[in-house]
């Protein structure tokens, strides 16, 4: 049985309701439907010109949706979480190709064919055009979905992702030398995967990232100082 959500944090609960309504309203307005699209969502971003992107579950939306379902027992969040988890499982994560690609979630991708100001709007199925990188990939939501459903295909994807992360980390391709988000997101993902499918290889991968962060973290400011002049918004 679920413990009903109380009213102690009313401001938070109000924001949750607004978020749910906003997700559905945007889905309807932008027609975020279709065999390859449903479950994903869109956002705008850019330096100067702003483009519309398929997020490919940027920042692990289904992880948040499923946690909200668990804390509230509200089935609406289960529906959203399952929809996005299945999209991540079937579309975002490649299941064939070289080790550098197979199991590596594809990050967000822009299309100039749909923008809010365009009079004629349509989508193209471009979820798989971009590449994969540890700075734009997440694993906790897929682990959540596997644990909550026992779905064998989700479990297979979790194992594929574990192999991909280990391959990237063993080849020093986890974002070392760049912004904190590469090593940071990779360590979060590897930690979740190590809890789901524990292995010495995953533990070594996590230790590799942790060692790099400790070695390069600024002892006073607590950040990793790297030049990112090509990205002025940072």
Model region roles, listed by residue range:
Residues 1-234:
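Catalytic cores of extracellular degradative/oxidative enzymes
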């Amino acid at each position: 049985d679920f413990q009903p959500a109380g009213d102690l944090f009313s401001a938070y609960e109000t924001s949750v309701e607004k978020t749910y309504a906003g997700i559905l309203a945007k889905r309807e307005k932008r027609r975020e439907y279709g065999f390859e699209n449903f479950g994903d969502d869109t956002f705008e971003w850019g330096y100067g010109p702003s483009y519309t992107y398929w997020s490919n579950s940027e920042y692990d939306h289904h992880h948040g949706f499923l946690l909200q379902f668990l804390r509230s027992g509200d089935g609406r969040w289960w529906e959203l979480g399952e929809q996005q988890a299945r999209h991540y499982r079937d579309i975002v994560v490649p299941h064939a190709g070289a080790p550098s690609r197979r199991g590596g979630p594809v990050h967000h991708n822009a299309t100039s064919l749909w923008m809010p100001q365009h009079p004629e709007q349509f989508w193209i199925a471009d979820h798989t055009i971009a590449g994969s990188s540890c700075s734009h990939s997440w694993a906790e939501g897929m682990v959540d979905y596997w644990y909550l459903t026992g779905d064998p295909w989700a479990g297979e994807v979790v194992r594929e992702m574990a192999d991909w992360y280990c391959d990237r980390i063993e080849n020093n391709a986890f974002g070392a030398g760049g912004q904190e988000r590469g090593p940071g997101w990779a360590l979060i993902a590897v930690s979740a995967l190590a809890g789901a499918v524990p292995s010495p290889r995953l533990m070594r991968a996590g230790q590799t990232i942790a060692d790099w962060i400790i070695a390069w973290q600024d002892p006073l400011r607590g950040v990793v100082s790297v030049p990112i002049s090509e990205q002025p918004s940072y």
